[in-house]
Structures are given as structure tokens and as C-alpha cells.
Amino acid sequence: MRDQFISLALILCVLHSACGLYFHISETERKCFIEEVPDETTVIVNYKVELYDPRSNGFMPSSPGIGMHVEVRDSDDKIVLSRVYSSQGRISFTSHTPGEHVICMFSNSTAWFSGAQLRVHLDIQVGEHAIDYAHVAQKEKLTELQLRIRQLLDQVEQITKEQNYQRYREERFRHTSESTNSRVLWWSLAQTVVLVCMGFWQMRHLKSFFEAKKLV
């Protein structure tokens, strides 16, 4: 019971986490992030690009002419999304296979801005945190109680997806372990057979040598 409670708490921590950060890149640099995503889960990527201004020794709040090429690949290395966006945007996609999704970003560099330093603000939201409940309440005309029930149902659904994903990972790990153990066993048997054959051959060779020398 205690282990189940700890597992549930960890899942809730994962569900309530969002990746908010910023990083610096040059225009020729490619930056990638890995996000563990269950299947049929919505992922929202919010980003904003700022250009370094050497005159003010800071970053411009807007970067006209600079866009970001965003590419998303799923756990099977298939492209989920790949296109050029503006310097600030909101990207949404839904996972169809569970596992690691790689989100890569790089600028659509031009000769004018070539070699410039960029600051990229990035916020990745997964699952029910990617849902704008204020918009949902307004669109579907939900009361506060109905909206809260909707949020709880979405949280339960996301917890179920996370649990299914953990079972999927455990199954893959078990399959990998069994496959590795099987290969180790067959390799050990092969080594044993080779050693027995070499020992038998050496005994035959020594016997022939002693007979030739008339020592036996």
C-alpha cells in the first residue's frame, strides 16, 4: 500500500511539472530536448526567440526576420512535426506512440543575422497541463464545479496513461533483460563446448605424440 502511494505521488509530481527554461544558441546551432510522453497525449511547446544586441549588451525582446525551425521525432524516429515558425509561437502535437520524443530547434539563419547569438525561452507542457481550461470553460459554458470535475477526469485519464506507459517500459526492460540473459547463456554454452573440444583435441594430440616417441 505504501509503495502504491509513493508511485501515485511520483506520477502526480510528473503530471504537475512543466519544463520552463531559456538557453543561448548561435544561429548555426541545433538544440534538442527529450521528453518522455505516453501515447495519445497532448504536448504544448511555447517558445520566444530574442536576438543579442551588442550596442545595449542585452537581448532584443523581438527579433524580426528570425524564425525557428522546430522538428519533433517520436520513439520510432519518425517525424511528427517539422516546419519553420516565427520568432515567437505556440506549437501543439499529440503523441501516437509512447516513449521518448525528441524536440529539436534551430534558427532559419539568414546572411543578415549570420553568426548572431540567440536566447530562446522554452516551456514544454505535457498532458492535462497542456489544456487551456479557461478557454474550455468559456467554449463549453461550464460552471466552476463542472470545470473542476472535468479537470479531475483529465487528471485521472493522464494518470492511467502514465501507469500504462510505466507498464510498457517495464515490459520492454523485461524483454531486454530476458534477451540479454539468453544470449549470455548461449555464449557460455558455446565457450564450454569450444573448451571441451580443445581439451579433447589436445589429449588426442598428446597421445599421438607419446606413441610416436614410444613413450606409451
Curated annotation (Swiss-Prot):
Stored SMART domains: EMP24_GP25L (SM01190)
Coiled coil residues, start to end: 134-164
Topological domain ranges for the Cytoplasmic compartment: 204-216
GO CC annotation: COPII-coated ER to Golgi transport vesicle; endomembrane system; endoplasmic reticulum; endoplasmic reticulum membrane; endoplasmic reticulum-Golgi intermediate compartment; Golgi apparatus; membrane
Disruption phenotype annotation: Mutant embryos exhibit reduced dpp signaling during early embryogenesis. Maternal tkv is not active and is not secreted.
Highest taxon listed in the record's lineage: Eukaryota
Keyword Repressor attributed: no
Name the UniProt record assigns to this protein: Transmembrane emp24 domain-containing protein eca
Organism: Drosophila melanogaster
